[in-house]
């Protein structure tokens, strides 16, 4: 292959730079195997592109800029696993001029023609109808007047989707005509085609993400089911979430699993595909909200919760590898097609800046990141994530200092960190039914919080802390070296000690995604010195970096527990002041 003939991982701007981080991570792995990969990032220079300048090429998100950059890499291959709809729009326009044929540039993975079939929300709706799935009543509008006409034949609330906007910018739920006019006007301004899709809102339905892995030979498996505690109407990045989904009936789960796999196969997508559902809590009816074949926070969360990278596996599948031939990344003597079965809960708590504390949560993203916890039960996983929040002093609101009226407002208006307000209300003796009505939470989730309050009141139970592997077989198979471990309060330890190991403590700020590169470089630096490295972190993308990973709150108790298992030679702490 000539020097300018590369595998280009095309990548755009995304929430918490998930796409860029994942692309850089995978390019580094490919190049370690002589993959000749580069990341082509369409966006502005930032700390991540500067840290990884040797493998990242930066270009403007403009047609002419992309064309000029690609001409420097004639004969190369383009991989779109980390792209987005705005990038697709530019690629469609280049394809229409015959650019890729003239430049001998090949798209690997699904073709552009395949992406065209569901590029717009309206296209996705037609596909879902072809597959006999329910779709909400909708209309594609190009003016506020058209939006008003549509609203006359449908009940509020109405969902507004600006067509192909950046990171879903401009998505809104209109509860009345004034909301609608304002939202459509803004949506038209951020849509490249100056169009908005309006549809009946599934506001208040249960929201779930199912992640499917599929190869070009049609081998596939369900990698993850992620359940949002907050209902449809609050962006999933701002919602408390956990995996696997555990509050569904078997019929509900099988219906959604079958639909997710059916859609992925029908569209002939390869790699990692996230399908977002809205489930009617009063029936078995469900709606498909979105099909996303690109890098997303759902795939990032699923990767951390499984203990191995779905991004890495997805890239291999788009490059033509088969799930039946790829070795499982974590489990001994198994192939990658193995479908996960988890015996633990992985819980996410979103984190908000001071400026966002009084925001009313909706379909726009307000959080800047998240912390995670694992446990045998939802309450144990939640408490571990909460411990990280306390250790890092990430919570800057104090529910215990608020009046009852303030708590009610915070809960009813869907404001950031509202689970903390609900917990405080439960401690004060608010009635269960009253909180159900205020919060609109599922009774199951509210009961979990009520259980936490009761546990705090009770006598502290005797515990037997144990480290268990983050792995997808519920303990049926042996895990490979480099696995991640979590802490449960009762169990039999399965973390076998390392000798003369260096413990690297990742105490860096969560809000800056670029700090992942600092962690990676420090691990490499220590390993080049011949040291075995144990990484303690609460950050995604850290799988397989070190000889062992612990997903733990970073405090003295955690470090003491590690030292009771592993022979620690040294402790190195990465902190913000370095």
Please identify what each model-predicted range represents:
Residues 453-460, 523, 527:
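Long, charge-rich, low-complexity intrinsically disordered regions
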Residues 35, 102-105, 528-531:
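A short helix->loop->beta-strand "cap" motif at the edges of active sites that frequently abuts
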Residues 515, 522, 530-531, 537-539, ...:
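C-terminal interaction appendages of subunits in large macromolecular complexes
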Residues 4-5, 104, 110, 193, ...:
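Phosphate-coordination loops involved in phosphoryl transfer and adenosine-cofactor binding
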Residues 63-135:
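Conserved N-proximal alpha/beta basic substrate-recognition cap immediately N-terminal to
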Residues 2-65, 69-74, 97, 131-132, ...:
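ATP-dependent carboxylate activation and anion-phosphoryl transfer catalytic cores
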